[in-house]
């Protein structure tokens, strides 16, 4: 019996030692690849990302902050308007463009310039470039109406009632004094897009019911410039382009009188080479230009420019291409030849997509 217990104890000891040795071998020779893979998985899924602190770098003295703000739109913006005026001066000095950029400061020009004596402002009217809104601003400033919203639409263009005197109504001495000392501005847009707007407004829609455009001016253009005399349609944009591009257009202009203000050049309207304007605004950037003009004129605390509908000032090349579709290159080139001064004076790109 005693021997049986000794044998059982010996077997138990052998089994115990075998288990210890097996555990030791397992711990010592585990597959490193399996372990490292498991650890990598845990690191990617459970460990938060630890970001290194930025290393301190040596900053050259001239690049260290000075406390001054970087240029923003309030500082950059005046440079845009200075560049516009400089471009006008350069084009005005170009003898090759003299016939397209210069015009006498005649009564026709002085009739286009409206006066706000109270705030010493002169505004040259360039129709089809949002001029109705600028007239409203000046009417309020002159005190004829307390707010823009209260001005009846029929009064805006009635110069006997709207309280806006024309510069031509003053004596020569008073005209010169105002031209030299007042804040002067006008607005431009792409010349060809303006012509499209004029054609639509006066010959297609005619929202102000001005029947003379359709019943007097349109027939005169058709008689002179329509190639197919048997065609009975009303005036087409092609007829309008031929009229405007004709070097001998002036004899018709004389018959049409002041109605031509809606399509003659900016040069003919405002004489930018003869009159030193303070600011030239662009229809395409009116959202920025309108507040800037009000500020420069010192009236931004008195009146605001009416809200501009989204997208209305954006240049629409597709529309331009549509209207000029089917018109001969010869007629388009003649049109550009007349308006080349406007394109160059105000920095508008030559419309090669129509000319070539």
Curated annotation (Swiss-Prot):
Role this protein plays: Catalyzes the transfer of sulfate from 3'-phosphoadenylyl sulfate (PAPS) to position 3 of terminal glucuronic acid of both protein- and lipid-linked oligosaccharides. Participates in biosynthesis of HNK-1 carbohydrate structure 3-O-sulfo-beta-D-GlcA-(1->3)-beta-D-Gal-(1->4)-D-GlcNAc-R, a sulfated glucuronyl-lactosaminyl residue carried by many neural recognition molecules, which is involved in cell interactions during ontogenetic development and in synaptic plasticity in the adult. May be indirectly involved in synapse plasticity of the hippocampus, via its role in HNK-1 biosynthesis.
Family to which the UniProt record says this protein belongs: Belongs to the sulfotransferase 2 family.
GO cellular component terms listed in the entry, alphabetical order: Golgi membrane
Enzyme Commission designation: 2.8.2.-
Residues with attached carbohydrate: 99, 228, 316
Protein name per UniProt: Carbohydrate sulfotransferase 10
Alphabetic keyword roster: Carbohydrate metabolism, Glycoprotein, Golgi apparatus, Lipid metabolism, Membrane, Signal-anchor, Steroid metabolism, Transferase, Transmembrane, Transmembrane helix
Reactions mediated catalytically: 3-O-{beta-D-GlcA-(1->[3)-alpha-D-Xyl-(1->3)-beta-D-GlcA-(1->](n)-4)-beta-D-Xyl-(1->4)-Rib-ol-P-Rib-ol-P-3-beta-D-GalNAc-(1->3)-beta-D-GlcNAc-(1->4)-O-6-P-alpha-D-Man}-L-Thr-[protein] + 3'-phosphoadenylyl sulfate = 3-O-{O-3-S-beta-D-GlcA-(1->[3)-alpha-D-Xyl-(1->3)-beta-D-GlcA-(1->](n)-4)-beta-D-Xyl-(1->4)-Rib-ol-P-Rib-ol-P-3-beta-D-GalNAc-(1->3)-beta-D-GlcNAc-(1->4)-O-6-P-alpha-D-Man}-L-Thr-[protein] + adenosine 3',5'-bisphosphate + H(+); 17beta-estradiol 3-O-(beta-D-glucuronate) + 3'-phosphoadenylyl sulfate = 17beta-estradiol 3-O-(3-sulfo-beta-D-glucuronate) + adenosine 3',5'-bisphosphate + H(+); 17beta-estradiol 3-O-(beta-D-glucuronate) 17-sulfate + 3'-phosphoadenylyl sulfate = 17beta-estradiol 3-O-(3-sulfo-beta-D-glucuronate) 17-sulfate + adenosine 3',5'-bisphosphate + H(+); 17beta-estradiol 17-O-(beta-D-glucuronate) + 3'-phosphoadenylyl sulfate = 17beta-estradiol 17-O-(3-sulfo-beta-D-glucuronate) + adenosine 3',5'-bisphosphate + H(+)
Biological pathway: Steroid metabolism; Protein modification; carbohydrate sulfation
Enzyme class: transferase
Entry binding sites for 3'-phosphoadenylyl sulfate: 127-133, 189-197
Lumenal side: 28-356
Signal peptide: none
